[in-house]
């Protein structure tokens, strides 16, 4: 909006009206700016609420630009002055009130996000693709932060570190989840394509074998692992979930082994895990090839579950996995599930 080109002018025409209107409704419709932001995010699928966007733009800059164009400045925008609508204080998030004070942003019980967990803390481990956080109660959180949370060797490095942290006794359980729209869109195919094109086959072998060993270290470790999924969990992302002891899935989780669509096959244990699950189900198709035919049908057509419930029907979720309806509760529910698994935990048989 600072630029005088067509894009800048259009953005200003839209946001100047939208954001100033939202600000002008305080305190008419609510005295709490958090309610406005939540309403726009939950009701209209905005990534950020009006006051969160104003903080990114700078409230004082926005107010000055309104004045320079002869537009009215909402009272709360004048009141905040050179400050921000949201500030971090004492490891908590506070919001600006109509009285000019800052008070803590309260959340309903059971709401938990990575931003809540990480506020005022430093990660236990980080690289460009993954961060490890202390969730409290001796539970470790692995957060994917790559583009679309795609899985690359750096994520496998981070998951190996998470396994080491838990095996050493520093943590008693692991949750894998994030605040993003998607759990993981799968393996980083751009990287895989590049190393194939340059003929670095040793690197391909390392990527495949490293992924297998890492996921097996999670599946057969001495600690419980819970996958907190939402949105897309495709290919390698699906295989990460299949390696977990439990999956705490948001109802709108779309799971599938889609590798065939790009000319490869699942390489990190997905085929083996699906065969194990379908073969163990007494309701599966009978005969020596019954389960195999069903698996080939799903893998060969790169079928993706359209919901968590369908994922259960397709055996991506087991009967012991759980479904959470509210996205904001997924991480908390996953943590609670992990805590419940700790006492008397024993890893699956090594042959699984």
Label every model-predicted segment:
Residues 1-181, 190-223, 230-233, 237, ...:
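N-terminal glycine-rich phosphate-binding loop for ADP-containing cofactors
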